[in-house]
Amino acid sequence: MALPRSGNTLFASLINQNPNFACTANSITMEIMKDLFLLKQTDVFKNFPDHKSLDNIMDSVYDLYYKDWSQQYIIDRSPVMTPGNLAVMQRHFKQPIKCIIIWRDLMDVLASYIKWFENEPTAFPNKYGKNTIEEKLMMLMNKDGAVAKELVAIQNALQPQYKHMSHIIKYEELVTQPKKILQSVYEFLGIEYYPHYFHNLNQFKINGLNYDDTVVGNNMHTIKTEMRLEDNPYKKLIPQSIINKYGHIKL
């Protein structure tokens, strides 16, 4: 669980070196659970409220979705810790919930977005009639967008009653101390450490599939083959209005 452009794809590329692990792309499983749950609000269901039968399906979503995946451990990438999502999962996911949170400062996330959409014409923020950087960033921060959902999920995960479910890693440490960070993840999961490599990294791929970034914009999920922490000059382009509105958001 992490904000977009916070090292999700890098983390997945690293952890998936272990053949027993599958860290997924952006997952649709939580959307499946939500849509099934919302069926209970429909007139058809209310007319014949067979909760048990629908609950049977919801109890089985994850087992069915990952039925043909060969890996022993699956890290499903979704905003599981929003209050609504967590309530559904606590009822229907029949295993302990463990959540890995990657945190990157929000202003660095937005600077990464700026660098991407200012240099990539196909980037989705360029497709909605938004002309200025401020307009594009405000669109990204929409309350129904991925950034907002992940922020809500992370905020909820940090509540005292849920902290035991979560393990927080910082983007900067993932890049500069990857072995130490991955060791902490294995310890959190209670799994024996696997020797990873940290140079000449592969692009994300799982079960023969990779992202089709023609949907959201080229290079949205492209990672560098070598890890290094760099200053992003595009951070200077973040409008003051955005800083005033969101700059206070910290871990």
Regions picked out by a protein language model, each given a short descriptive name:
Residues E226-L251:
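C-terminal accessory extensions appended to soluble enzyme cores
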Residues I15, Y65, M89-Q90, L158, ...:
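Broad structural signal for hydrophobic residues in well-ordered alpha-helices, predominantly aliphatic
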Residues N26-M30, I102-M107, F198-N202:
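A short, structured active-site edge motif that brings together acidic residues
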Residues D76-H196, G208-N219:
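PAPS-dependent sulfotransferase catalytic domain
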Residues M30-D35, L174, G247-L251:
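C-terminal/domain-terminus segments
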Residues V215-E230:
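Short helix/strand-capping connector loops at secondary-structure junctions
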Residues M1-V61, D68, F204-D212:
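PAPS-dependent sulfotransferase catalytic core
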